[in-house]
Swiss-Prot record:
Substrate binds at residues 56-60, 127, 327. Belongs to the tryptophan 2,3-dioxygenase family. Stimulated by low concentrations of hydrogen peroxide (5 uM), ascorbate (0.1-0.3 mM), and sodium hydrosulfite (0.1 mM). Inhibited by high concentrations of hydrogen peroxide (0.1 mM), ascorbate (10 mM), and sodium hydrosulfite (1 mM). The keyword Iron applies. It comes from the Eukaryota. It is an enzyme of class 1 (oxidoreductase). GO terms for biological process: L-tryptophan catabolic process to acetyl-CoA; L-tryptophan catabolic process to kynurenine; ommochrome biosynthetic process. This is Tryptophan 2,3-dioxygenase. One of its GO terms (molecular function) is metal ion binding. Its cofactor is heme. Heme-dependent dioxygenase that catalyzes the oxidative cleavage of the L-tryptophan (L-Trp) pyrrole ring and converts L-tryptophan to N-formyl-L-kynurenine. Catalyzes the oxidative cleavage of the indole moiety. InterPro entries: Trp/Indoleamine_2_3_dOase-like, Trp_2_3_dOase. Pathway: Amino-acid degradation; L-tryptophan degradation via kynurenine pathway; L-kynurenine from L-tryptophan: step 1/2; Pigment biosynthesis; ommochrome biosynthesis.
Length: 393
């Protein structure tokens, strides 16, 4: 198989090797001498070589390299989100980079079965060499979580605070502290959603119209239920309608919503939740097509991280059972299983949007002005003006 970036002889035509003035070679550019010599097998150093230790090391090093790439993409996305007004080209770039993160996470999920080719006895042969090293000590994964938006108060505390394992590394503590204090992707997405066009009370006032539509829908359903001949069926339907009225109250009453946020059941601000619901309802409008794709990708990221955690939990249970402590002193399987809860879903509110959907026929119709604002098609006067301004720059 040929090299993907060039001929090993330095000449793409198969001639003589070029001198150093022609540029670095493949191995030099990728610094493969360092990368491929970084697999230090402690079992070999102890004169008790264990074959599967090499697989364990390579797999986890691959994880760390991909974590580094995800962090690189996240930092660039957060930078693009930091401006108050985002051009369409920026949204496209954000979509591209979010999709790249999704593809990487899919790869990481599929990487777990490779480790599972190792049996529990194989792992036991070199497990003692790992202590006190543990995946709990992966600095990059903690940075990744913080940059996405996992809050300290939502983390499960088992035996120790997540940052305490880095106490001997001041640089690591400083990096974690920075990511805890700077705006996460979730913070920036919320601010972006709060600016969703159509939420203005002196404009389209989507939220007011949505609340009216919900009240009308529930009133119609209540009237229909009252006509039910069978008393038990009527009571069941009325009880169901009342439950749904309470559910909708949790989004229409800002104080109820804020209480749910304080309790950790919701993450988004009230205004950001309004924006997410509006984008979901009018996702077929040109201006909301890309924002809706963006919300879908954020949920994909959350879903894939949860799948990766789950695969990791199952693998750990297969390797060491559910009672042993992890090599780093954590509670092992019990701790990992606890991270599967919704506490670790950064964009949990996006998953729960379907709770508040209403039939298409009940969705508030767009006014002519709002229809025009959300339908900036190619060739429209507004779009042409933007193109002229862009060309003049």
């Amino acid at each position: 198989m040929s090299c993907p970036v060039g001929n090993h002889n330095g000449d793409p035509q198969g001639g003589q090797r070029l001198g150093s003035e022609a540029g670095m070679l493949y191995g030099e550019y990728l610094m493969l001498d360092k990368v491929l010599s970084a697999q230090r097998m402690l079992s070999v150093e102890s004169n008790k070589p264990v074959h599967d230790e090499h697989l364990f090391i390579v797999t986890h090093q691959a994880y760390e390299l991909w974590f580094k790439q995800i962090i690189f993409e996240l930092d660039s996305i957060r930078s693009l989100f930091s401006t108050e007004h985002m051009e369409e080209s920026r949204t496209l770039e954000i979509l591209k980079r979010l999709n790249r993160i999704v593809m990487i996470l899919k790869l990481l999920v599929d990487q777990v079965p490779i480790l599972e080719t190792m049996t529990p006895l194989d792992f036991m042969d070199f497990r003692d060499f790992l202590s006190p090293a543990s995946g709990f000590q992966s600095l990059q994964f903690r940075l990744l979580e913080n940059k996405l938006g996992v809050k300290t108060e939502h983390r499960v505390k088992y035996n120790q605070k997540y940052s305490e394992v880095f106490a001997s590394d001041p640089c690591a503590i400083e990096r974690l502290s920075i990511t805890e204090s700077e705006p996460s992707l979730a913070d920036l997405v919320q601010k972006w959603l709060e600016r969703t066009p159509g939420l203005e009370t002196n404009g389209f006032n989507f939220w007011g119209k949505f609340e009216e539509s919900v009240e009308q829908l529930l009133a119609d359903q209540e009237a229909s239920a009252m006509e039910e001949e069978h008393e038990n069926v009527k009571n069941y339907r009325l009880m169901d309608i009342e439950k749904r009225r309470e559910v909708y109250k949790s989004i229409f009453d800002a104080s109820v919503h804020d209480a749910l946020v304080a309790r950790g059941d919701r993450r988004f601000t009230h205004r950001a939740l309004q924006g997410a619901i509006m984008i979901t309802f009018y996702r077929d409008e040109p201006r909301f097509s890309q924002p809706h794709q963006l919300l879908m990708l954020l949920m994909d990221i959350d879903s894939l991280i949860t799948k990766w955690r789950y695969n990791h939990v199952i693998m750990v249970q297969r390797m060491i059972g559910s009672q042993q402590l992890g090599t780093g002193g954590s509670s092992g399987y019990q701790y990992l299983r606890s991270t599967l809860s919704d506490r670790y879903k950064v964009f949990i509110d996006l998953f729960n949007l379907s709770t508040f959907l209403i039939p298409r026929g009940s969705i508030p119709p767009l006014t002519c002005e709002m229809q025009k604002a959300l339908n900036l098609a190619w060739g429209s006067p507004v779009h042409q003006a933007k193109q002229i301004n862009y060309a003049a720059k």
